[in-house]
């Protein structure tokens, strides 16, 4: 029992999204990150799927609540409602499909309009293991990321390459913004929550108490 309680202890909770066209491997990325194995029987997500994991980011324990959204157009109205209050997102395309790459601008627009004002985004070129079938070069995607102020990695849900790093980089940047004061977990819709009431109290400015009549020497 004590071990379970310890495993659920965390300093912050971040709401994450995984977005992009259908067939890009979003569900497989989520499964690889949480279970450390490839989900080879994955079907297209219908609506939204959910997963969570606690990670250690620079000595802070962060619980990621991750919403894997359907990529088909007919589910867009449903999945858009889950954007609200997201602190971070993986924007996923398939390196073997230019169609999924060309759709990135629409996904990016949705994320920045509907999610948290300061949402942190990382671009993930998935299916890196299929390099021989590549339709989108690393350089082209890297330029897109730079132009749109995104972090960028190529990933493989099959081999696990860069999967954990993608989530870690995104979480690390959010944590850095909290520590610098750029992000305020107290702000409604930030997609961030304190995981411990004591930590929240420590990070809140201490109120100056007025001296009592006995202390003031009146």
Curated annotation (Swiss-Prot):
Residue positions, PTM Phosphoserine: 190, 204
Cysteine methyl ester modification, residue list: 218
Modified residues (5-glutamyl serotonin): 72
Entry's EC annotation: 3.6.5.2
Domain of life: Eukaryota
Binding site for Mg(2+): 27, 45, 68
Name listed for the protein in its UniProt record: Ras-related protein Rab-4A
Keywords per UniProt: Cytoplasm, Endosome, GTP-binding, Hydrolase, Lipoprotein, Magnesium, Membrane, Metal-binding, Methylation, Nucleotide-binding, Phosphoprotein, Prenylation, Protein transport, Transport
Sequence motif: Switch 1, positions: 44-49
Role description: The small GTPases Rab are key regulators of intracellular membrane trafficking, from the formation of transport vesicles to their fusion with membranes. Rabs cycle between an inactive GDP-bound form and an active GTP-bound form that is able to recruit to membranes different sets of downstream effectors directly responsible for vesicle formation, movement, tethering and fusion. RAB4A is involved in protein transport. Also plays a role in vesicular traffic. Mediates VEGFR2 endosomal trafficking to enhance VEGFR2 signaling.
Species of provenance: Mus musculus (Mouse)
Chain span(s) of sequence motif Switch 2: 70-79
Subunit structure comment from the entry: Interacts with SGSM1, SGSM2 and SGSM3. Interacts with RAB11FIP1, RABEP1, ZFYVE20 and RUFY1. Interacts (membrane-bound form) with NDRG1; the interaction involves NDRG1 in vesicular recycling of E-cadherin. Interacts (in GTP-bound form) with GRIPAP1 (via N-terminus). Interacts with RABEP1 and RBSN. Does not interact with HPS4. Does not interact with HPS4. Interacts with RABEP2; this interaction may mediate VEGFR2 cell surface expression.
Main EC class the enzyme belongs to: hydrolase
Gene: Rab4a
